[in-house]
C-alpha cells in the first residue's frame, strides 16, 4: 500500500500520465485564479486553502477526475452550467481528456468564496477571504 501523500506533487506522482496531466492543468488553473491560496492535502485530496478555509480541491478516481468545492451547496448555485458533467452533491466529475474550462473553475471558486463570506454553508460568519 502506498503511503498517504503529504503534498500535491506526491499525490500526482503515481497517477497515470493522462490523469496526472489533467489534474496538473486543473492545479495550474486554480493557482492562477487564487495565487494567494495555500496548497494542502485535506481528506487525502489536493486542496487549496484561503484564510484557513478550503475552497477547492481535486482527485483522481477509477473512472476519471473530480473537482471538489468543499461544500454541499456550491454546485447547486451553478446547476445550469454543470449539466454536462456527472456530479454528486459535493463533487463534479470530468474525464481526463476533457478539462474543466477556466471560466467554470473561476465561477466555482467565486461561488464558494461568496458562500463562505456569507456564512451560508455553516450558518455562521466566515473569516475574511480574498475577493476575485
Indicate where each model-derived feature is located.
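Charge-dense, helix-prone N-terminal extensions
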Residues: 1-132
Amino acid at each position: 500500500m502506498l503511503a498517504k501523500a503529504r503534498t500535491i506533487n506526491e499525490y500526482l506522482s503515481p497517477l497515470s500520465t493522462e490523469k496526472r496531466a489533467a489534474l496538473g492543468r486543473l492545479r495550474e488553473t486554480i493557482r492562477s485564479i487564487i495565487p494567494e491560496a495555500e496548497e494542502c492535502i485535506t481528506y487525502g485530496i489536493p486542496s487549496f486553502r484561503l484564510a484557513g478555509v478550503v475552497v477547492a480541491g481535486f482527485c483522481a478516481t477509477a473512472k476519471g477526475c473530480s473537482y471538489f468545492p468543499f461544500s454541499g451547496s456550491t454546485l447547486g448555485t451553478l446547476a445550469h452550467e454543470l449539466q454536462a458533467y456527472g456530479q454528486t452533491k459535493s463533487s463534479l466529475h470530468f474525464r481526463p481528456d476533457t478539462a474543466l474550462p477556466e471560466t467554470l473553475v473561476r465561477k466555482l471558486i467565486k461561488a464558494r468564496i461568496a458562500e463562505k463570506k456569507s456564512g451560508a454553508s455553516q450558518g455562521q460568519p466566515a473569516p475574511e477571504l480574498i475577493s476575485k
